[in-house]
Amino acid sequence: MYVLHVCSELFPLLKTGGLADVVGAMPSAQIAQGANVRVLVPGFPAICAGLPDSDEVATLDTFAGRVTLRYGVYRGVGVYLIDAPHLYQRPGSPYHDQWQNAYGDNHLRFALLGWIAAELACNCDPFWRPQVVHAHDWHAGLACAYLAARGNPARSVFTVHNLAYQGLFNARHLDELALPHHFFQIYGLEFHGQISFMKAGLYYADHVTTVSPTYAQEITHPEFAYGMEGLLQWRAREGTLSGILNGVDDTIWNPASDALIARTYRRETLRDKAENKLHLQTAMGLEVNADKPLFAVVSRLTDQKGLDLLLAALPTLLEGGAQLALLGAGDAQLQEAFLAVAAEHPGQVGVQIGYHEAFSHRIMAGADVIVVPSRFEPCGLTQLYGLKYGSLPLVRHTGGLADTVNDCALENLADGSATGFVFHDANAADLARAIRRALVLWGRPTLWRYVQRQAMAQSFGWDLAAEHYLALYRRLL
């Protein structure tokens, strides 16, 4: 089976979010199960630097100018990159300029990604042709439309990683994209008078997946669908919408072998985890005290992630004698608010603005509790890392968080299924109650260690997810 993943990011070469982690791990897992898998990505500077020995496959005259398709191998996975310096060789973010403004030609930059995917399905590379094109998020959504316009030379799967980002562009750009005019309609890629790359994927793909079963159900409801509920309800009725839970790359996120943490440990040597906590307290300017429960956040600072709820619930955490370590960046007001709390509570609250992959590993290993209070969360990887590292997740019951964390309710403690702390309502009061439950359990060290071991026993490797996706591909062929 020949499979092409189409995406805008690829860990560890380029990452702005969890999408990169997924596409960085899934192809290898599918290859291990016998599939012939390659990845198509734009030639952003970091990706080109990671594939210095790529070979030319073809030079193409496109609606976005002349481009070169190149091919190389990265960590055992074949990677096609679109070499188009006039589109992709820009410093900083792949999506916006230094002032956080989206690039004015993003419609061309990411339409080209989908167009090249369709070209590969039409034998652009004479030595390899995909049977399945698997497009990820809005950046790759037009791949499904271009395939449909060419009579579907390959089957297509479209995965929604976050429906909130839809890739909306002015309708005047349609003539620039080499798509049939009749595609711009309600039964197509038109969305309230605009071109929607997300809707193109949702409508034209043979099958739509999301990154957790609960999120697949949630996005059929208006409060989660961002205006797409009608289309997604139709998909669900047709049986062409499903949720497949993301996995964790055990070669990168594994406390038993993680070279980025102060001391490795496993379920059987959980006491060694304490050394990581002391190192983290020192690094974050917190009081070095193993008896203080250490809550941690590794997140984009946005309302979606519920960090405003955490701000409002912080008095409960601080009055309970706990500490908070936060690593993240995003909304300027949230950044300032957390920095102000850190200044007001030195030794108890530590904040680092920005994102550092290596330091996120140290936080995961050193924390007692990982807080993920999201208003919505398609899958979430942070809570999976927390489970893996025995840092109990405190999460809101939504999306993939609901699918992966079981609350420390009495019945769950009794039957051994408890793995963290769950609150349901998106408000500070319910979050504060979950914080209090965590503090109560912290006061019972034997029970806390028992739940830690249960959390670390959970299995969320990529093998199972890869198996589910390959089964889906086989049904489509």
Curated annotation (Swiss-Prot):
Pfam families: Glyco_transf_5, Glycos_transf_1. Pathway: Glycan biosynthesis; glycogen biosynthesis. GO terms for molecular function: alpha-1,4-glucan glucosyltransferase (ADP-glucose donor) activity; alpha-1,4-glucan glucosyltransferase (UDP-glucose donor) activity. It is an enzyme of class 2 (transferase). Keywords: Glycogen biosynthesis, Glycosyltransferase, Transferase. Its EC number is 2.4.1.21. InterPro entries: Glyco_trans_1, GS/SS, Starch_synth_cat_dom. One of its GO terms (cellular component) is cytosol. It comes from the Bacteria. It catalyses: [(1->4)-alpha-D-glucosyl](n) + ADP-alpha-D-glucose = [(1->4)-alpha-D-glucosyl](n+1) + ADP + H(+). SUPFAM superfamilies: UDP-Glycosyltransferase/glycogen phosphorylase. ADP-alpha-D-glucose binds at K15. GO terms for biological process: glycogen biosynthetic process. NCBIfam families: glgA, PRK00654.1-2. Synthesizes alpha-1,4-glucan chains using ADP-glucose. Belongs to the glycosyltransferase 1 family. Bacterial/plant glycogen synthase subfamily. This is Glycogen synthase. It comes from Edwardsiella ictaluri (strain 93-146). The gene is glgA.
